[in-house]
Structures are given as C-alpha cells and as structure tokens.
A protein has these predicted regions:
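Noncatalytic scaffold domains of N-terminal-nucleophile
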Residues: 1-139, 143-187
Length: 189
C-alpha cells in the first residue's frame, strides 16, 4: 500500500497492492491454517505495486531502483538481536525447509548476532525483475511459484499471479489539531 501526496497540486492518491486471496481458496483461515502455513499464502502484490508507483512517479531507471536491494541480498546484512529473535521464533519451521536453512541458519542452527546473511537466489530473482519488469515475476516465475506453494498445501496458482493488478483508491483524510492527515483507508503497516 502506498499513499502519495503531491505538494505542487495538493492532490493525494492511494495505491493498494496488498496481497489478495487466491481464486481457488474458498474458505477463510481456520484452525487448520495454523498447521498448514501454505494455506495462508496470498497473491503477492509488492512487485506490481512498486512497479506501478515507479511508472507514475519514478525519476530513475527501473534497474537503478532495484540495485540497492540486489546489492543487499547479494552482499548480505548483519543479524540484529531483533532478527535473531524472529529467526528463533520460527526456527523449527525454517529447519524443515532446506532452501530457508541454507540462507538463514548456520550448520542447522540459528545464526549469531553480527553474522551476515546473504541471499543469492533473491539477488538473482531481483536482477531478473530489474531487467524484465514485473512480468518476470508474475509470468515467467508463475509456474515455479505455483508448484512450490501447491506442493506445500496452498492454493496460489499461476493464473492468480497473472491476473494480479494493483488498484487506486481514495486515501483516508482528516484534520487533527489543524493539520491535514492523509493516510491509507485500511489498517496496515
């Protein structure tokens, strides 16, 4: 989700690119969804949303915009106490997935504060998206994503990815102590 305000025109806009529910998922989350995390996977909108924002407001090339994220994934970042806490919280889950273990665990154990985490597969995916736009994610990788999610019990399909579109909405507005407040019409972080 993104709220944008143009000081020159005084106009505000809101772009919704939250995840959506897969078309084949007919029930809401229930007690079984806690056991099957893949059931909770929605249609991701981040890539399409950022691209739409870039098309409308961007001032650098798409490739330049993604370079810092590519560099961070490739060169890595240090484990902070808060990141370590998050990893320890889902350690059992991570340990059961070799792809996650290889990136986030050290010899099968949580990393230490100060260790560097590198994610070369993410760097390569971001490079592909930087070169080919969001279609690299929503079309080219769609079958691979579908197979991965469905093999784990989720509902996400390649067709869900292909159909995903961010959409514009009116932002929430109000006044507080003489200041105009412009925000998302939904709760979010």
């Amino acid at each position: 989700m993104a709220t944008y305000y143009c000081a020159e025109t005084g106009q505000a806009s809101f772009l919704n690119f939250r995840e959506t529910t897969p078309a084949e998922q007919t029930s809401l989350l229930d007690e079984h969804s806690q056991e099957n995390k893949a059931f909770q996977i929605g249609v991701p909108g981040q890539t399409a949303g950022i691209y739409a924002l870039w098309e409308q407001y961007g001032s650098m090339s798409w490739d330049q915009l993604l370079q810092p994220a590519i560099q961070l994934a490739r060169q890595g970042y240090q484990v902070t106490p808060s990141l370590l806490g998050a990893i320890e919280l889902i350690y059992g889950e991570m340990a059961s997935h070799p792809e996650l273990s290889e990136i986030y665990l050290r010899d099968g154990l949580p990393p230490r504060v100060g260790d560097v985490i590198q994610n070369e597969p993410l760097a390569q995916t971001l490079e592909t998206i930087a070169q080919n736009g969001p279609s690299a994610f929503y079309q080219n990788l769609a079958q691979e994503i579908e197979m991965s999610v469905q093999s784990a019990g989720g509902y996400l399909t390649a067709d869900d990815l292909l159909r995903y579109q961010p959409f514009a909405e009116h932002p929430a507005t109000g006044t507080y102590r003489g200041y105009q407040i412009i925000s998302s019409p939904y709760g979010g972080s």
